[in-house]
């Protein structure tokens, strides 16, 4: 579920300079506090030796116990970055290349998660219906409804407005869910459709996929770090959002799967042509080989 910037991780060419993590950091219900043993088992024992910054996002499985605990892991884990539930970092890749990393918390923006129907949002599934075999009862729903998705959208629009509009800087947006699933506020029309957003990376679906929304092929699923499952694309998706008067308005976004592969793997993103192009490659981790790529120009 990790996306790597600038280089191949396993191949040994051009080692990466940073990692973008699309969420679900600690299965099944997240961590209880900063002393939770899962931190060592699922992260530090596996990745702490990589020696590069990790820009982390929250997934739905991080919402069961304490999402806030992950915001302070930087105090004990070198390289762990999660400034807030959603945040922006401006990163100098080189003297001439700047990348704006906008990390969203898409979880409170999925309308199914805000309902009272537990079957739509239980992060532990049928095996652990309330997470009690692991630790304590799941607090997923109360954690979700405590967040304001509309406020996050206004924040994201403000961040984008602060970035130069001359395409001199790259903008990478990271979220846990596929673009069409972020439906309790209109992130698609009001934010992601903006041409200043060059790439959107998500996890959640446990596969690799390149897809387009509203004709823009700048979207990818890089959720194949583990528990690989079958994923599907869609030709169109209709989303309904209640307005402030309780009425529902219909939004239709054309979603098309361009390429997908059900395989354990990751993506790499390499700056080329003097920083004017980024090549995204999808990697089969078992074969240690690139299986698909596409280019985006600034």
Outline where the language-model segments fall:
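N-terminal active-site segment of His-dependent metallophosphoesterases
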Residues: 1-35
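Conserved acidic residues
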Residues: 17-19, 169-171, 198
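Short, solvent-exposed aromatic-acidic interface loops
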Residues: 281-291
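Extended active-site neighborhood of metal-dependent phosphoesterases/phosphodiesterases
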Residues: 27-165, 187-199, 205-270
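Histidine-centered catalytic micro-motifs
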Residues: 173-180, 200-208
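Short acidic, glycine-rich surface-loop motifs adjacent to enzyme active sites
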Residues: 160-181
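Hydrophobic residues embedded in beta-strands of well-ordered beta-sheets
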Residues: 276-280
